[in-house]
Amino acid sequence: MKVYLVVVDTLADWEIGYLTAELHSRRFFADPSKDFQLLKAGVSRDAVTSMGGVTHTPDLAIDDIQMGDNDLLLLPGADIWESAQARPALELARNALDHGHQVAAICGATVGLASIGALNTRRHTSNDLGFLKASCPDYRGEHMYRKEPAVRGDNLVTATGLAPLEFSYEVLKMLKVWKPETAKAWYRLHKTRQERWYHELVASMSDTPAVLS
């Protein structure tokens, strides 16, 4: 399994922080030995700078991505999603969705998907429905819009930029790399900050391995 994180200038660090930390560390994986890679993909192999000033050097170019059955294309928020620079990533995302591959997009990346009509027939959310309708001429997906922090469909997760925790939770469930009880405890711990969920998270790691359904 590979997760391809699209890295671009102005990438919104906080929107993917929970998710990339857990995927890279594998600390709560049901099977830590699982064949898994988190790869950074750029428009080119040139380094980019995130909104927080962090430099990212892509492992490969977007044009070189070959999506496998269980792979995920991860699109973080950034200021570039309505520009020509974003087109290669958006076209890859649309093609991936059409072929049943997994895609996750948050904040501005959802606007990019809406702008090419990729959300018209798929359940989704974004920062604001009115903005999608006003700024994306090819958007016809109002009937599929859900006013929720994050929405998971068959092979697509979308989220508002204000919900990085919910976004991460839905993506991790879609990838099925954690046990259900691990995912629940992890999410509730971060959401409520209650001690009981820390103990449940620890306890979940001592049980027989299972995967999310």
Spans of model-derived segments:
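Active-site-adjacent pocket-lining segments in enzyme domains
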Residues: 2-6, 10-12, 18, 25-44, ...
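Short gly/ser/thr-rich secondary-structure transition/capping motifs
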Residues: 52-59
